[in-house]
Amino acid sequence: LNAELESWNNKKDPEPEQPECVRQNRRRLKEQGIPYQQFYKIIEFDTGLTREQADRIEEALMNMGVLDALIISEEYREQVYSLDPGVCDKYIFSDVSHVKENLTQILDVDNGEQDILLYHSISNILSAIGFGSREEQSGHSWIDREGNYRIGVLEGTVTKEYKARFI
């Protein structure tokens, strides 16, 4: 029993694969004192979602590049954009505009530290990505109930075979 407990305690949560340029960028952000949160680590699926819906939503977030994107306060935008060559990443800054039907309907902020500023920033980001049916969405970024998505001018579909494991 103790060995099994120790095994569980030593297990890391699964993490999306990242190219070396992303890992290097995140090390540099830490070195420069630029705070960030990985999107998938601070949200949870709403308990009303089915397993199949959660799978499709997470796959869409991964395909969009949002799942492992870094959430960073807008005050660090210029510093982030002026980082050294050879690093890359995806960022979501917290100064986004809202849409009526959005991801706050299906995702909850995991705010274990009770940080009101973090909660507000993440809620702003979730409310900027539309959710619902394709016909209802007029924003620049959305996910529909089947996992189809749009981010800017790019639209995409999901395999419907993916199994959620990060959120």
Predicted segments with their positions:
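Hinge-like oligomerization/junction regions that interrupt long coiled-coil arms in large cytoskeletal
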Residues: 20-167
